Amino acid sequence: MIETYQQPLPHGITLSCRAAGEPGRPVLLFLHGFPEGAFVWDALLEHFAQPQNGGYRCVAPNLRGFEQSSAPQEVAAYRPKHLVQDIAALVAIETRGAAPLACLVAHDWGGAVAWNFANQHPHLARKLAIINSPHPGTFLRELKNNPAQQQASAYMNFLIREDAETLLAENDYQRLWGFLANPTAGSPPPSWLTEAVKAQYRSVWDRGLRGGCNYYRSSPLRPPRPQDPAAAAVDLPLSMLTVSLPTLVVWGLNDTALPPELIQGLDAFVPNLTLHRVPDATHWIIHERPDLVTRFLQDFLQAAPH
């Protein structure tokens, strides 16, 4: 049974949350990406809340800017330090400051927040699980040096346009459905994208798209252009990139926006790494292979840290 609630944070932001499991139990926190919402985690919330699967307190916030969470209009409000602050505050509330998260689980933009969180606040979580979300070190490397990644990420330069949210909303969100569909022209929509699931997406998108687009506007990690150096002007020290937590990475290899070159050399930044490459899965592996994602996470949670 999923409960929904509005969680005020001490610094004035409110996050709309979905949760399952008893408060006071070890906490799993799940972070979604763009253009999604917390609802994408419902099956995992219910699974891991069950006593036979760990009996966790499972919480999935809608990140700031999404669904009914606070959605500041200014781009600066979506800088990484603010996104990490939201999650650190939510962790303190959900764990009551008594113990670290059992695991922080994240996909896409949620993963970008989670990588930063794990680097800055390793004492607040025991483990990290990432699903098709590039580590900033490998992402920066590929954006600077790999023309294929620059082309794959070209959509980012569309999403930073001032009229991006207006264009995304046109024709019943035609472009957003395209993000979720199979990339081959003329191919049918994926089987997981049912009318019921579409209604869940619309319930998020109908509340506004500016917040989601502001994630892209606030980040320099995008392909360089003649008038905009973007990633080419960024250098990050190793101290900002190293993640010491035991980390699970699950990667659908058919991700057209985030190709598998992004997991090459990942162990240089994440020494305690468990990596699962999944053929025939895309960026939307949570929807395509929920059974596999659940099993990988279950095994990772049960494994002793090493």
Locations of the language-model features?
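Conserved HGGG/HGGXW glycine-rich cap/lid loop of the alpha/beta-hydrolase fold
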Residues: 20-71
